Amino acid sequence: MAAAAASAVNAVNDCFSIGSTVVCTTCFNEEVEGEVLAFDHNTKMLILKCRSKSTEELSDIYAMNLSLCSNVQVIKECNGNFDDPQKLNLEQVKMRLRKTVERRQDYLKSKNADVSPEAQELYRAIAKQYGYNEVSWQGLNIQILNEVTISPPYRVDNVVSSSNNETSCNYIKRIIKQFFNTRPSPVPESGAAASTSSPSVSPTSSSLASGSPVPAN
């Protein structure tokens, strides 16, 4: 990865310029296409103006670290005539960067190599309600508020409270029920009897869907 990134950076150092259109492939295999606004050779930071995903009236500004990109391609050279870029709101950029880093850190907290991807998704569903600082892995168990524990296989019957807090337990059980009820049914294996089918389950309405606050202890 490092060698590929280095070769990609070296390839564009002498050929792309401000106003050119570039496509960068990140280390997460995501492609970002945009117009070059600036490039710092020392830090290998490339600033791109990209089409906004939410509105055509605005543009998204991406700061790409080329040292972490697996590929960089110039798809359109600048014709030499381009408008000066607008001044960036540095405070807004710093705030967005901080939020992006926080989201990535929160996602990493949910990772556990010893449990299934489904268990990690359940962890994130619970953390969205309580906050990532209130949820943690204790071995194979999910611990919430340092008092409620969910053990494998992470169903309603596996919820235990060390302080007999029924309010928290019931709320967490509703999260678990909604999580599994809204997951797609497994695809039946080929050759299975046509008469065997799992009943469809519709999501249950609860305080989670309405965004009601977490009950206090």
Swiss-Prot record:
Subunit structure: Component of the Atx2-tyf activator complex, composed of Atx2, tyf, pAbp, Lsm12a. Interacts with tyf, Atx2 and pAbp.
GO molecular function: RNA binding
Location of the region described as Disordered in the Swiss-Prot/TrEMBL record: 185-217
Domain of life: Eukaryota
Cellular component terms per the entry's GO annotation: nucleus
Purpose of the protein: Component of the Atx2-tyf activator complex which functions in the circadian pacemaker neurons to activate the TYF-dependent translation of per and maintain 24 hour periodicity in circadian behaviors. Within the Atx2-tyf complex, likely to function as a molecular adapter which stabilizes the interaction between Atx2 and the translational regulator tyf.
BP GO annotations: RNA metabolic process
Biased amino acid composition, Low complexity: 190-217
Pfam hit, one: AD
Protein name, as recorded: LSM12 homolog A
All residue ranges annotated as the Sm domain in the record: 9-78
Null allele phenotype: RNAi-mediated knockdown in pigment dispersing factor (Pdf)-expressing clock neurons disrupts circadian locomotor rhythms, with mutants displaying long period locomotor rhythms under constant dark conditions. Enhances the period-lengthening phenotype of tyf mutants.
Family according to the record: Belongs to the LSM12 family.
Ranges of residues in domain AD: 86-184
